[in-house]
From Swiss-Prot:
<feature type="binding site">
    <location>
        <begin position="89"/>
        <end position="91"/>
    </location>
    <ligand>
        <name>ATP</name>
    </ligand>
</feature>
<feature type="binding site">
    <location>
        <position position="18"/>
    </location>
    <ligand>
        <name>ATP</name>
    </ligand>
</feature>
<keyword id="KW-0173">Coenzyme A biosynthesis</keyword>
<dbReference type="InterPro" id="IPR014729">
    <property type="entry name" value="Rossmann-like_a/b/a_fold"/>
</dbReference>
<keyword id="KW-0547">Nucleotide-binding</keyword>
<comment type="function">
    <text>Reversibly transfers an adenylyl group from ATP to 4'-phosphopantetheine, yielding dephospho-CoA (dPCoA) and pyrophosphate.</text>
</comment>
<protein>
    <recommendedName>
        <fullName>Phosphopantetheine adenylyltransferase</fullName>
        <ecNumber>2.7.7.3</ecNumber>
    </recommendedName>
</protein>
<feature type="binding site">
    <location>
        <position position="88"/>
    </location>
    <ligand>
        <name>substrate</name>
    </ligand>
</feature>
<keyword id="KW-0067">ATP-binding</keyword>
<dbReference type="GO" id="GO:0005737">
    <property type="term" value="C:cytoplasm"/>
</dbReference>
<keyword id="KW-0548">Nucleotidyltransferase</keyword>
<dbReference type="Pfam" id="PF01467">
    <property type="entry name" value="CTP_transf_like"/>
</dbReference>
<dbReference type="GO" id="GO:0015937">
    <property type="term" value="P:coenzyme A biosynthetic process"/>
</dbReference>
<dbReference type="InterPro" id="IPR004821">
    <property type="entry name" value="Cyt_trans-like"/>
</dbReference>
<keyword id="KW-0808">Transferase</keyword>
<dbReference type="InterPro" id="IPR001980">
    <property type="entry name" value="PPAT"/>
</dbReference>
<keyword id="KW-0963">Cytoplasm</keyword>
Amino acid sequence: MHRRAIYPGTFDPVTNGHADLIERAAKLFKHVIIGIAANPSKQPRFTLEERVEQLTLVTAHLDNVEVVGFSGLLVDFARDQKASVLVRGLRAVSDFEYEFQLANMNRRLSPDLESVFLTPAEENSFISSTLVKEVALHGGDVSQFVHPQVALALKEKIAAMKANKGNK
């Protein structure tokens, strides 16, 4: 059995789909590291620290899950964490091509690092962080897609963003 796995992502914000995959990965592996990518090129709404806090809250009930922020190459982070498996989620066939290319690149850079793909529960298959942010930006209720504290934080973040735009 592989002991250590990494589930990497930006998690901006963490959704119920992410939480579902984390719970299932926690049953499959002895230790799961949620690797939150700093990834400034994506211009996340939440800071790395806020995303670490959110994931820590969402995974607090899972004893074998650890939340860690990182920057740089994922394969280097995996090596530093002594992880042998990357867990990735596939929501739809459209995700497969990108994930397949990413898995092959990671394998080329680190041949001992395996990629494992999990699909979300049907009720979470359409949820993405991008869609959740879009719904929230237009005043929609996102509470059915994210943890209640994450929904509140997103609402506050968008209100602050709109207030800052109004002051300029």
